[in-house]
UniProtKB/Swiss-Prot annotation:
NCBIfam families: lipid_A_lpxA, PRK05289.1. This is Acyl-[acyl-carrier-protein]--UDP-N-acetylglucosamine O-acyltransferase. Homotrimer. Its main location: cytoplasm. Involved in the biosynthesis of lipid A, a phosphorylated glycolipid that anchors the lipopolysaccharide to the outer membrane of the cell. PROSITE patterns: HEXAPEP_TRANSFERASES. It comes from Rhizobium meliloti (strain 1021). GO terms for biological process: lipid A biosynthetic process. One of its GO terms (cellular component) is cytoplasm. The lineage of its organism: Bacteria, Pseudomonadati, Pseudomonadota, Alphaproteobacteria, Hyphomicrobiales. Keywords: Acyltransferase, Cytoplasm, Lipid A biosynthesis, Lipid biosynthesis, Lipid metabolism, Repeat, Transferase. Its EC number is 2.3.1.129. GO terms for molecular function: acyl-[acyl-carrier-protein]-UDP-N-acetylglucosamine O-acyltransferase activity. HAMAP family: LpxA. It catalyses: a (3R)-hydroxyacyl-[ACP] + UDP-N-acetyl-alpha-D-glucosamine = a UDP-3-O-[(3R)-3-hydroxyacyl]-N-acetyl-alpha-D-glucosamine + holo-[ACP]. The gene is lpxA.
Length: 270
């Protein structure tokens, strides 16, 4: 079904079954598969493939060379009807690739709203991305990665499968992210080492100075205490019940995960 207001270049192939919303623009030499849904106001520039069971949210813009909704690159991919769901108002730049999920792990790759994917970044199967995230050029997310709201990943960084990146974390360019990164954490290097808190991001998010000072104190107690990271976090929880950002970090640490936690020491040399 193609809305009457959609504008589609005659050189593009729209397969039967695709759903094309109002005011969608599709430029030259694009391929839209039979199980694709493009919501209203989506814009696809040129030489883009949107395939698989893929839905693209309202107002999202996709630049040349992107391949959206390709099969999982997992060796265990069952080739069944898994899906990719992309939210509203995302910008997907040149050469970006996003894969559908795998049946074995829920069958869906989920991307939220207002995200920016710069050139040649990659979102693998079964990833879960929140809102207002930036993946800079050549960022690589392996399968099953979770990236929470407002995280920023610097150019060329690579994230190990099943890793979690907390809300408003900042990953430096060319970093290797092998372990979970706490909310508001900053990670740099290869191997990646936690290097403090994203204070600039916290300030931009409207967190006031007294709260930032408390979160800094919480951070030191977690990573410089005598016990393990998780034991230290559990021991201080009651002290921060009235500080939402600190509790967010403590809850993140307490949650079950397939990966260990990044720290100022794990991965550091010397």
């Amino acid at each position: 079904m193609i809305a009457s207001s959609a504008k589609i270049h005659p050189s593009s192939a729209i397969e039967n079954g695709a759903v094309i919303g109002e005011n969608v623009k599709i430029g030259p030499f694009c391929h839209i598969g039979p199980n694709v849904v493009l919501a209203d106001d989506v814009e696809i520039l040129s030489h883009v493939a949107v395939i698989g069971h893929t839905s693209v949210g309202k107002g999202t813009k996709i630049f040349p060379g992107a391949v959206i909704g390709g099969d999982s690159q997992s060796v265990h991919h069952s080739a069944l009807n898994t899906k990719l769901v992309i939210g509203e108002n995302c910008t997907i730049r040149e050469g970006v690739t996003m894969n559908t999920g795998t049946v074995e792990h829920g069958g869906a790759t989920i991307v939220g709203n207002n995200n920016l994917f710069l050139a040649y970044s990659h979102v693998a199967h079964d990833c879960r991305l929140g809102n207002n995230i930036i993946l800079s050029n050549n960022v690589m997310l392996a399968g099953h990665v979770t990236v929470e709201d407002r995280a920023i990943l610097g150019g060329g960084s690579a994230v190990h499968q099943f890793t979690r990146i907390g809300r408003q974390a900042f990953i430096g360019g060319l970093s290797a992210v092998s372990y979970d990164v706490i909310p508001y954490g900053m990670l740099n290097g290869n191997p990646g080492v936690l290097s403090g808190l994203n204070v600039v991001g916290m300030t931009r998010a409207g967190i006031d100075r007294p709260a930032i000072h408390r979160v800094r104190r919480c951070y030191k107690q977690i990573f410089e205490g005598d016990g393990s990271i998780r034991a230290n976090a559990a021991a201080i929880r009651n002290e921060y019940l009235d500080c939402a950002p600190a509790i967010e970090i403590l809850d993140f640490i307490a949650a079950e995960s397939d990966r260990a936690l990044s720290s100022p020491n794990r991965g550091a040399k010397g």
